[in-house]
């Protein structure tokens, strides 16, 4: 055991018409990583809030019935929150903000699978670095291609290049994109003072998350994680911890049709209005 102090952790997952297969894979991986965490820490009962944003919710905890024994053994309590409709990703997570009693809170997408050492590595980093309020993991697609979850402050030009230019033209801006996506980060050691991280996986110091008042609910989808990253950064460091590893299905707004593109542009407009416009100059 590294530490005999009880460690409190909670998890929230916002889903929208998510498949049972996808959610089972996530919860199964969560059980495995919690089991490894318990080998290093005394972990209190762990609430996992499944927040179902579906307009006609069909999700039932019966989906997980066949590994209820594993959940019980690791003292993981699934709590289903539904009936509120599609309120958006950020507001969905905020629905349980006033129910968080843990020292650490993990925000997750449903299309995630966690490596077995993921939580042990993340919690150890946070326990060892008291000024860190949020940790972001190494992520890859199912095919093993790396995702870049850490970002510098964006410019409008960079978003246009990444989202709308064909691959051939996008290659002309490879240095700009690499700078924005922080390709220079090492995957061996933790990197500190990251400006912005993806909302698909945010391991947060709960106190800082609550002080930041969670997500800005004016963002229905997209940029809510950028905004929260910057506001969380007012209370401490955001670190990239590559020893935390996940698999993430992911997706790009500009490739999901007009409705997603419209939401992306509306949220982007709000983000830049709030935090400052940069049309061409790329931070970093």
Give the location of each predicted region.
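Short aromatic/hydrophobic "clamp" motif used to bind/position activated sugar donors
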Residues: 105
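Active-site-adjacent helix/loop segment of glycosyltransferases
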Residues: 226-230, 234-284
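A conserved acidic beta->alpha catalytic loop
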Residues: 49-63
